[in-house]
């Protein structure tokens, strides 16, 4: 109702009969003359069709082209971009999770009706997620958390149960609640390895910056708030309050942004990539980027010292491989800039797999697995038994691998997925 009507165009062609028998312009010829004159064309020479507005029609609120044109008329100043295959920067109205970009959110105060965009884009995205799950469900309502391959670090590529929105996002909790127990007297156990790739990163950093690693190993250390503090995004008082349990929306959001920045920067993301992935301005992304590399300078040294081997494939093309001293495997290296990401992600996957192997030896069944997280279904009353199993298994991983940083796991119980992750 608030979007402006949009023009519907038609092509007007030069008429076949421009003139009457007496040499004057025909009715069609006169229309062509007037049309050419309005566009600055010479009617005697212009042969191509001319696009004109035939009528004005109601807008399509799902058309991103129309939405962007409307926002531009409202003096929209985009601050979040994507890049198309040609390398062009495309301004984003909404982020991957369906929420509005900050530049559009900032316009809501002046144009309150824009709030409808937030609801519309999120709901459309969430309906798509649920529809895909319904299509994949069997006759009894079960879906399979399927795998359709591996990454170069041997991590599963997932399908079916993918793009499940975070509980922090609109309707995320409701969608996660769709994954539930089979019987009333059962509970789900969700367990993931605590800050897995951050801990494996610390394992490698120990030989370069042990004092920083010791700081990270303190009981109340929060790597994401530490990064935010070093960037000046939060105060020491705010960090202390958060650690004491006062999780204000402002600090929670800052921590969320710096958590994403922590992981993205570890694997070579630049300012533009950070801006796009986190849905923040380039200025905010730049602060995160500078703060990260000030604290984590050793990551570049670790990458430079990695063991690299070049091998010719069957086409006699050079393939580069990186040796992982923890798994004792060589991993395909896509590009030289991916040295640390390949090393650290490969280590994380290996540690997780060793943990899973230990669990399966004692309890040969998993309900689901996503990245560094597993889900078990068990009877009520057996929670402590399951907790002991998971903790003992991660302890066995520590004894076996002897990393410079001990691994651990977080454990939660609940009736559905929204309660456990």
Summary of predicted features, one role per range:
Residues 269, 273-274, 353, 409:
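Helix-rich, typically C-terminal accessory recognition domains appended to large enzymatic cores
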Residues 201, 270-280, 374-391:
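Catalytic palm subdomain of template-directed nucleic-acid polymerases
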Residues 256-267:
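Short, amphipathic alpha-helical "recognition" segments used to contact nucleic acids or chromatin
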Residues 1-20, 290-307, 381-421:
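Polymerase palm active-site segment centered on the conserved acidic dipeptide of motif C
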Residues 2-247, 305-373, 388-396:
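Acidic, glycine-rich two-metal-ion catalytic cores of nucleic acid-processing enzymes
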